[in-house]
Amino acid sequence: MNFEGKLVGTDLKVAIVVSRFNDFITNRLLDGAKDTLVRHGVEDSNIDVAYVPGAFEIPLVSKKLAQKGEYDAVITLGCVIRGATSHYDYVCNEVAKGVSKANDVSDIPVIFGVLTTESIEQAVERAGTKAGNKGAEAAVSAIEMANLLKQF
């Protein structure tokens, strides 16, 4: 038997957790995610957005939203750009671990859509220019995974 999640968002309710830090990038990711959800049939009224100060705060809020029982998926969006210190490594590792843990404590998908880039140029490329929009890609993953998990 094969199981696959369809890319149909009708009747799905989705939460998006987005970081305000580097908002010139995260706003583009958010726009891409919301546009993709709506294009796949998710009603705009079924998309809730929670803003957090930075990427480090994403895991806690995504876990709380996932545990509420109101959503079919949670999408996380943020942008961490390497600087001159090791802060980048700590933030990236903890955000990835935290989002993974949020998946472990809920029955819905928590999708990792946080950019971890070496430069501002890489971030811009992944927020809607030549490398696509990773927010849109995260939305597609959320729809597919939400529909897949409904089969179990």
Swiss-Prot record:
User: Which pathway is it part of?
Assistant: Cofactor biosynthesis; riboflavin biosynthesis; riboflavin from 2-hydroxy-3-oxobutyl phosphate and 5-amino-6-(D-ribitylamino)uracil: step 1/2
Does Hydrolase show up as a keyword for this record? no
EC assignment: 2.5.1.78
Which parts of the sequence bind (2S)-2-hydroxy-3-oxobutyl phosphate? Answer: 84-85, 126
UniProt keyword Ribosomal protein present: no
* Keyword terms of this UniProt record: Riboflavin biosynthesis, Transferase
Q: How does it assemble?
A: Forms an icosahedral capsid composed of 60 subunits, arranged as a dodecamer of pentamers.
| Protein name, as recorded | 6,7-dimethyl-8-ribityllumazine synthase
The source organism is Staphylococcus haemolyticus (strain JCSC1435)
